[in-house]
Amino acid sequence: CARRVAVGAVAKGYAAGAVAAALPTGMVLSLGGNVCVTGPKPDGSPWVIGVQNPDGDDTEYVQRLDITSGAVVTSGDYQRYYTVDGVAYHHIIDPDTGWPARHYRSVTVICADSGLADALSTAAFIMDEESGRILLETYGAEALWVYADGSASWTGGCDAYFHS
């Protein structure tokens, strides 16, 4: 019996972090739901990173974040999915059920390391919010959860990033 290891939950984040590490200070690298910031803008101000509204188009945001360095990574159910008999099935599978996780529309994680942010956003997407908060606190990361009804919740440290 052949065994396979799927690294999709961290591969893009790891790759983004590796590329960002080679960039000069003050750059933004965006690979879809993985964004790395290597320092503030040349004028010293933060970069504004949008958290996409899962029900909107690419220009609609649930929140905008002021980021001077680190990673912002989103896992969601609204871009990579297929439809069977009118039911959408996305790619983030809950290992307890074997079916796509249905807690949220998206989870966005903010932390220093892109690979870690990628892994945490996927893990938090599968977990209930309370368990996700405990996991994120362990790694010093922040997160924003978007629910199917459009409501959102976030860790306390996110307030410092919210663009005014």
Where are these regions (language model features)?
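Mature catalytic core of soluble alpha/beta enzymes
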Residues: 1-164
